[in-house]
Amino acid sequence: MLLTELSTARIPEVYRQFAAVVGDGHWKNRVGQLKQKIRGNRFLGQHLQNENALAYQFERLRELTAKFGRIPQWEANNHAIYPAASFAAQVLSIMEVSPRQFAEQLRRRVHGAFKNPDDMRGLRLELSAATHFARRARRLAWPEMTGEGTFDLLVKDVGPHGLAIECKAISEDKGRKIHKREALDFYGLLWPHIQSTIKGLSTGLSAVLTVPGRLPTKHADRLALARQCGAIIFGGRGASLPDGATIRVAEFDGSRLGDIPSTTRPGEVRATIDEVTKTSNRQAMVIGTHAGGALALTVQSGSDDIFMKAVFDRLSDSAKRQLSEDRGGMFLF
């Protein structure tokens, strides 16, 4: 039976069991790899920590266990580790009532989820869906275990043949020509080439790189593009590049950024950045300078993003392959 409630008093023991069954080396190694990547690119820190939040939570629990022999009770009252604790408890509860083959399959899936944020999002969404129906006393089955289909979850007592649930975790990059990680990697390549620009910059300067489709795939080509961008930004005038990319450079009043560093409303931050860069919902970053200025960097594609089309194309394909006319179906994303 899927666990839907967990007391804080049980968190230390739940972690101990989860670490023994899954292996704490999976989150230890993952966090070690992420820290190495962050050391290589200062702009990756927040993004990778957000994308791998559970791995960081589990690693904190591992470190505390190594130091104290078990998780101290005061840490069990820390809300920041509740997502990891609930994930561990639910995975264990499923494995305990599953045939050995399915339990091992789930264990391997958890291993993969620590390596791939998209897989972790998908697995957590399935657990959330299962929790929703379990708390309403519905009878659940996993088609992977029963062979009743290729969808994620079956609610057996809804409708004459049950209700098929298919979960699709949609990331913020869906349908975008420029993904966030790509932009951050490019900013890391650009960083050494904008030092002369930001040194002593006391006003606002916006630089918008527009590529015809996507950023170059080869590292050498991206590095060359970063060098070109750095030189153009330093010159203070926009330019067109032979490959069709363009760079627009313009000054803005730095005071327009206002209280961006202290605001907790993402919508306000996005609106302000869009205003100073004259773009709309693009991958952008603002770097403050010691002289009181700011450099706003934006990477965008000349081709339109197609978020809604990408989502509905995926759902349409999944409906054809995973759902049937004989049983009710539901998508969660």
Which residues does each predicted region cover?
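Metal-dependent nuclease catalytic core centered on acidic motifs
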Residues: 2-16, 23-25, 38, 42-46, ...
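Short N-terminal edge-element motif at the start of the domain
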Residues: 120-139
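Beta-sheet entry/capping signal
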Residues: 139, 152, 162-163, 330
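Active-site beta-strand-loop-beta-strand hairpin of nuclease catalytic cores
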Residues: 155-164, 319-327
